């Protein structure tokens, strides 16, 4: 029956994958393990990148909050300075800003700087701190990274999966 009907078919696959930069022929189990390791690394690197971006933005928001408290003095320093370097040094000394924060404030148009709300900046600061905390806790343990990978793969299966067409009895 198997020989004369298409009840049993065999097909071959080319299961070559790059493992640590070298091509290897993998079985199904090894291919799945390599894929999971890859996804774990992707989640780790993405989380580290997002954490670095959030920390960078948090530093800028902290500097803006310092400047917003005495916005009139900031505008006076900027307008009273001969050039950008003098204004930057004055801002750094007056408000104890970092070089990056002072540059960001100087690059911002004055009308945008004056329209910034302290409340908005404080809410953004709180959000950034919570995001950084979540990302640090995610990066702290391998189990949480694997749980994130599992959640992402479940989401992909939910979005792109097709339901079973035959019934198992």
Indicate where each model-derived feature is located.
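C-terminal interaction appendages of subunits in large macromolecular complexes
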Residues: 2-169
């Amino acid at each position: 029956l198997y020989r004369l009907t298409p009840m049993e078919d065999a097909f071959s696959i080319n299961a070559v994958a790059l493992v640590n930069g070298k091509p290897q022929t993998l079985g199904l189990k090894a291919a799945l393990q390599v894929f999971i390791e890859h996804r774990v690394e992707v989640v780790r690197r993405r989380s580290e990148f997002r954490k670095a971006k959030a920390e960078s933005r948090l530093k800028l928001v902290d500097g803006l909050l310092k400047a917003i408290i005495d916005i009139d003095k900031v505008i006076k320093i900027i307008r009273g300075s001969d050039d950008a370097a003098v204004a930057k040094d004055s801002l750094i000394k007056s408000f104890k800003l970092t070089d990056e924060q002072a540059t960001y404030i100087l690059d911002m148009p004055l009308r945008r700087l004056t329209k910034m709300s302290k409340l908005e900046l404080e809410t953004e600061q709180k959000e950034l701190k919570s995001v950084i905390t979540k990302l640090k806790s995610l990066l702290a343990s391998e189990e949480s990274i694997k749980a994130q990978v599992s959640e992402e793969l479940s989401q992909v299966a939910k979005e792109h999966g097709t339901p079973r067409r035959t019934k198992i009895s």
